[in-house]
Amino acid sequence: FTQICPATRACVPQKDARASSKLDAIGDRLMFRLAYRNFGSHESLVSNYTVKAGGVAGIRWFELRHVTSGVARVFQESTYQPDLIWRWMASAGMDKDGNLAVGFSASSPNIFPQIRYAGRKATDPLNTLAQGERHLFNGTGSQRRTNNRWGDYSGLSIDPVDDTTFWYTNEYYDATSSFNWRTRIGNFHVTGAAELPSLSND
């Protein structure tokens, strides 16, 4: 993979933002935490980090297996970067059926920072987020100054009641400003159906 923003961590563009207001990609570390699953037949860890792909930021996600005995190995991995939108500040998780989702921020010179997610069913071809991408919430403003930080970090968790609902939270702005960020919480399933996410107000 190619490191994103090796000279300066702040390189993610936003709509209607000054050049000095590019956002921090934080491409030098894993995002969120490794999510662990024990399926009986195997154990998995999933996580991600931000990389440079196609001239923009993309999500490098992966699943490790044999994580508690023997030599851990990469079971699947891929860089998710389907177009020229910058995607970063992601969080990965896996439900009880082995379906995987990645929530993340998305931005470009033409859009305000947005909250999106993509996923794969356990039966999908390896190394793909074959269920595609959906918008959880579209911001309507950009962040100015505040040391270029963004998210720190986003969070994706599985509902302990049904073990299939993904709950995701991330940052957005409803108006361009230097400090008044908002937080959005939403939930969704990776089912293959064209399901709209459920949202909670911040």
Question: Model-predicted segments: where are they?
Answer:
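C-terminal PAP-associated
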Residues: F1-G192
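Residue-level detector of functionally pivotal "anchor" positions at catalytic/ligand-binding pockets or at interdomain
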Residues: G192-D202
